[in-house]
Amino acid sequence: MPRQVTDIKLFLQLAHRGDATSARVKKNQNKAVKFKLRCSRYLYTLVVADAKKAEKLRQSLPPALTVTEVGKKA
């Protein structure tokens, strides 16, 4: 089941949980970046409009987490 998260700090706490298995980073055409975090029960989604914040968040994800880049289609 999907859940939308609006707070970056809460998203990072969820990413550091033990049941977080993977994350996907999706870039939209309108410059928004979606972070999708797969946990055991929910798929958490965070939408970041600022590219600099998105890059900092991408670097702040735990190294044990599998991160997949999903770009826009050419």
From Swiss-Prot:
Spell out the Pfam families in the cross-references: Ribosomal_L38e
- Please tell me where this protein is predominantly located: cytoplasm
Record's subcellular location: Cytoplasm
Q: Which UniProt keywords apply?
A: Cytoplasm, Ribonucleoprotein, Ribosomal protein
Q: Which GO terms describe its cellular component?
A: cytosol; cytosolic large ribosomal subunit
GO MF annotation list: structural constituent of ribosome
What InterPro entries does UniProt report for this protein, alphabetically?
Ribosomal_eL38, Ribosomal_eL38_sf
GO annotation, biological process: cytoplasmic translation; protein-RNA complex assembly
Q: Which family does it belong to?
A: Belongs to the eukaryotic ribosomal protein eL38 family.
What does the function comment of this entry state? Component of the ribosome, a large ribonucleoprotein complex responsible for the synthesis of proteins in the cell. The small ribosomal subunit (SSU) binds messenger RNAs (mRNAs) and translates the encoded message by selecting cognate aminoacyl-transfer RNA (tRNA) molecules. The large subunit (LSU) contains the ribosomal catalytic site termed the peptidyl transferase center (PTC), which catalyzes the formation of peptide bonds, thereby polymerizing the amino acids delivered by tRNAs into a polypeptide chain.
> Note on file?
There are 2 genes for eL38 in S.pombe.
What do we know about how this protein assembles, alone or with others? Component of the large ribosomal subunit (LSU). Mature yeast ribosomes consist of a small (40S) and a large (60S) subunit. The 40S small subunit contains 1 molecule of ribosomal RNA (18S rRNA) and at least 33 different proteins. The large 60S subunit contains 3 rRNA molecules (25S, 5.8S and 5S rRNA) and at least 46 different proteins.
Question: What is the protein name for this chain?
Answer: Large ribosomal subunit protein eL38B
Task: Quote the gene name from the UniProt entry.
Answer: rpl3802
